[in-house]
């Protein structure tokens, strides 16, 4: 389904230039798997970290040899595709990083969990955990405030903090609509919390510019060369491979067994002439 949509987007690119690019989060045709916002940088980060961690495994290990060969092959493919305007963006990002590095390493950035990581390849990766906005109409009201920003509000009954007289009046007004309109009730609590200083909008003064996206045609060509399904599936496989390397280095299966197998244990199963 998505491949057909890509072909259609490429064909109509002269009419709608924005159709040349895939919309992040849009359906891919696979349940639960949305379009990745920046698959190129994600794969570069995952592949380089995988290769770096594979160095902890002995060179004679067949797992290391096969994993390195596959990872290097796919990394070489990904590095060949560069989005339009990448060099100019890289220069802007470098200047922004030098000027606001302390802000970019904060736990919260633009309302999202984020961190700045330096990869083994020398690149700086800005990893952001995208949290979709929650629609309170889809949440069943159970009497508790479900907003994670409400660290000072435990339930709808008790409010911790200095409450001014006008704020007390506002709380009384909100309490009247608690059962009839829980959505407005919670939104009013949040607005009041921000005013009181108990709830802080976690937004950095720095506006980070994301990497220019690859075109739909570039992604389709990359998928064809890698040959492992959609690019989002390739990212998931790369994430699993990185986790597997961690498990292998912890288990150290290349070392001798703690309890050696008894001599002749497998003799019965040998194929004899």
UniProtKB/Swiss-Prot annotation:
The keyword Transit peptide applies. Keywords: Electron transport, Membrane, Mitochondrion, Mitochondrion inner membrane, Respiratory chain, Transit peptide, Transport. It comes from the Eukaryota. It is a peripheral membrane protein. InterPro entries: NDUFA5 (IPR006806). One of its GO terms (cellular component) is respiratory chain complex I. Residues 1-8 form a transit peptide. The keyword Transit peptide applies. Pfam families: ETC_C1_NDUFA5. It is found in: Mitochondrion inner membrane. GO terms for biological process: respiratory electron transport chain. Belongs to the complex I NDUFA5 subunit family. Complex I is composed of about 40 different subunits. Accessory subunit of the mitochondrial membrane respiratory chain NADH dehydrogenase (Complex I), that is believed not to be involved in catalysis. Complex I functions in the transfer of electrons from NADH to the respiratory chain. The immediate electron acceptor for the enzyme is believed to be ubiquinone. This is NADH-ubiquinone oxidoreductase 29.9 kDa subunit, mitochondrial. It comes from Neurospora crassa (strain ATCC 24698 / 74-OR23-1A / CBS 708.71 / DSM 1257 / FGSC 987).
